[in-house]
């Protein structure tokens, strides 16, 4: 039971900072389902949840083969989701569905940066971005891709006109 509480706490730290998340999601219960859990009750080290990982909180859904939470001096510093691919989806406050997939999704809490590595795709109503590496800076909202010798593909959708 104590291990389950630790896992819920660690995963909640991952989910609490997504910039465009539906704000009401943070106030809802979180459900975590997986085949296996291996958590440390210390201030330093890695804890993992593996096997058909499903994490849901409100409109946020995360699917992965494995989730690893890294703690340094008692604070969560990094969360790594891996899968074939790892997938995230969430509805924002405007009711728009946002999706992200990659072989590995790494969230650095200290720098508020998310790296999508390996077949990365971000889809949202305003457009999409695809590449081997996509970086998302939560503070600035900046998406960067490429620069590693691979190419990126982007699609920008026109702004919809308000109905009269």
Task: Identify what each model region corresponds to.
Residues 1-164:
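Mature-chain termini and adjacent capping regions
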């Amino acid at each position: 039971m104590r291990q389950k509480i630790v896992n819920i706490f660690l995963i909640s730290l991952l989910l609490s900072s997504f910039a465009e998340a539906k704000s009401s999601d943070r106030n809802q219960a979180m459900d975590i389902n997986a085949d296996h859990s291996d958590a440390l009750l210390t201030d330093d080290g890695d804890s993992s949840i593996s096997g058909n990982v499903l994490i849901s909180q409100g409109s946020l859904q995360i699917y992965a083969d494995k989730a690893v939470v890294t703690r340094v001096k008692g604070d969560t510093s990094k969360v790594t989701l891996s899968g074939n691919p790892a997938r995230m989806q969430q509805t924002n406050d405007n009711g728009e569905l946002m999706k992200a997939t990659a072989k590995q999704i790494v969230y650095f809490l200290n720098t508020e940066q998310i790296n999508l590595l390996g077949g990365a795709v971000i889809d949202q109503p305003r457009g999409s971005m695809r590449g081997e590496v996509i970086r998302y800076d939560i503070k600035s909202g900046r998406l960067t891709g490429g620069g590693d010798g691979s190419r990126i593909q982007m699609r920008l959708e026109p702004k919809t006109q308000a109905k009269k």
